[in-house]
Structures are given as structure tokens and as C-alpha cells.
């Protein structure tokens, strides 16, 4: 049984707990009592019928002959057998009714809660002591085997006090159930520990990334020619700061090897009809045009109103 009590078993009992179940059990109890009353009524009617039948049998037996007496005996035997069977069925029904009534009485009674002393008792684990007998081991003359055996023996001897400490710590652990407030405090402590471990993990990850970046920059290979710029600040006596920059001289081969920069020349787009600078762009043919007449001619060519002359190299 667990030493920590569950939340359902530890909470206080509600005022309306079990009301519906109690109503159902009371209805079942009323139904069972009515059924028992009906069975007793049937028994009384059955006894009255038996008495009447016995009186009739006496009257008939006094008037009938011997043959009729034999027939009556056979009938009486059959009735006795039926009576025995009915009695057995009645006994079975009464047993079932008694069992149901006992179950209802048992369920109506409030359940007994286990005492905290019995719930807090936790079976203690039994530890078997391992005794090492050095005389029972096989010995070897090899140096490596002897050293390994000695190291194993020392580890076993060192593990004994640690094992005793763990056993005593588990024995001294507080017994009993935890309240809701204690569970909240334990959850808050666990959350704080998780946050601190997460911060440490993030810090270590950042340090690892910086270290990888520095190593990559340190071991990066550059192709010559290389021009290196170094800038730094120097504090002077009057408190001012100055920066020194290293600039490559004009005689440096890197300055002469670079080609001169050429600015791109902007060329005006001409109209395909007039040859003038184009202002518009036909959205269908995507051709530059300068005015409305050029636009109309481009659309007429597009609609195949003009035919192409391969000899003259134009539309006509």
C-alpha cells in the first residue's frame, strides 16, 4: 500500500455524497419487502388449500371403496412430491431474499475508512548482506588478474558504508500522508529546480555556439592576396580617445589588380513604329509605343490586318 494518500481518499466528504445511491437502495429495499409480503401471503393461501384438500380427502375416503383408496394414495403421494418441490423452491427464494437484504444493509452502512497508522505502514525492503569470502575465489599468478581482483575487493569495501547510508536515509524518511498545502509547496520547489536547470542548459548552449563560431573563424583558410584592417581605441592622458586605421597604400598590388568601376549607361527605349522615345507600353504585346497612332498600328498588326513581306522586310 502506498504511503502517500491519494487525492480522492484525502479530501473531505461532501454533504450530499451518496444521496442518489441511498435513494436507489431504499427503493430496492421497499421492493424486496413487498416481494417478501407477497411470498408469505402465497404461503398462507397454500396452507389453507392444503387443509381444505385434506378434509375433502377424509370425506371421500369414508365413502369410496378400496380401489378408490388406492387411487387416492397415489394422488396423495404425487401431491406430497409436488409439496416437497414447492417447499424447496420457497426455501431457495427465501435464501435469495435474505442475501439481497444483507447486501442492501451492508451497502447502506457508511464505509469504514482505514486508520492513518495502518495506511502509513509501508513494508520495509529486506536487504540481503553479501559476504565475500576471499578464500573461496580462484587465485591466479598473473599480475593483471591479481590487480583486478584487488580493485574489485576495494570497490566492494568502499560500497558498504555508502549502502548503509542510503538504507538509513530511506529509513529516516518521514512517514505519513502529505496534505494539499504540502503538495503545492513540493510542486513549487520542483518548478524552481526545473527553471534553474533550464537556464543552465540555455547558458551552456550559448557558450557552445560561441565556442564553435570562434573555432570556425580561427581555422578558416583565406586565399591571398589578403588585406587586414585592425581598429582599436587608445586612451590618452587628457581623456580623449583616438582610433588608428591601417589603409593600404596605392602601391599595393591589390589596388592595381581591381578593374575600374563602370557606371551603367541608361538607354532610352524607342517606339517600334515611329522610332521616337517610348512613353507607353502595350499591355497585350508588351511593345513600347510613343502615341495613340502607334498603338492603333500595333493592334492592327496584332489582329493580322497587314501581311508581312519577306522581300521588303516590313508589313504592307
Curated annotation (Swiss-Prot):
Keywords attached to this entry: Chromatin regulator, Coiled coil, Nucleus, Phosphoprotein
Annotated GO MF terms: ATP hydrolysis activity
Record-linked Pfam families: YL1, YL1_C
Residues covered by region (Disordered): 1-81, 93-127, 153-180
Comp. bias (Acidic residues): 40-56
Coiled-coil regions, chain positions: 20-95
Modification Phosphoserine occurs at: 64-65
Localization, UniProt: Nucleus
Main subcellular localisation: nucleus
Family indicated by similarity: Belongs to the VPS72/YL1 family.
Subunit structure: Component of the SWR1 chromatin-remodeling complex.
Protein name, as recorded: SWR complex protein 2
Protein's gene: swc2
